[in-house]
Amino acid sequence: MEIKPNEKIRVRLESFNHELLNTSCQKIMEITQNNNVDNVGVVSLPTDKRIYCVLRSPHVNKDSREHFEIRTHKRILEISYDSSVNIFDLLVKSDLPPGVLYRICLS
């Protein structure tokens, strides 16, 4: 896949664990710095919070409930560069830890 100069690559990262997400951002930034790409910006997106309400008892006591929440932390890395290095292949081949969902968009 050929990439034109002055193009932008957006990498969207999502995870339930914010520490894992930050280490993944650092790893991608190291990959870009090793290939002489300096135009990297990290944008934190709002955290999604889902709350699930569950009855504790199977039959009665509707007043007794438990609440569980799942937080989804999100970041966007915007990489703009002007070089002959194929950053897209390096990002696809990068070994990110399990538990981090990433999407790579070319624009």
UniProtKB/Swiss-Prot annotation:
InterPro entries: Ribosomal_uS10 (IPR001848), Ribosomal_uS10_dom (IPR027486), Ribosomal_uS10_dom_sf (IPR036838)
Function of the protein: Involved in the binding of tRNA to the ribosomes.
Protein name: Small ribosomal subunit protein uS10c
SUPFAM superfamilies linked to this entry: Ribosomal protein S10
Subunit note: Part of the 30S ribosomal subunit.
Sequence similarity: Belongs to the universal ribosomal protein uS10 family.
Recorded superkingdom: Eukaryota
Chief subcellular location: plastid
GO biological process, alphabetically ordered: translation
Xref: HAMAP family: Ribosomal_uS10 (MF_00508)
GO cellular component, as recorded: chloroplast; mitochondrion; small ribosomal subunit
Species of provenance: Thalassiosira pseudonana
Disulphide bridges: none
Keywords associated with the record: Chloroplast, Plastid, Ribonucleoprotein, Ribosomal protein
Keyword Chloroplast carried by entry: yes
GO molecular function: structural constituent of ribosome; tRNA binding
Subcellular location(s) per record: Plastid, Chloroplast
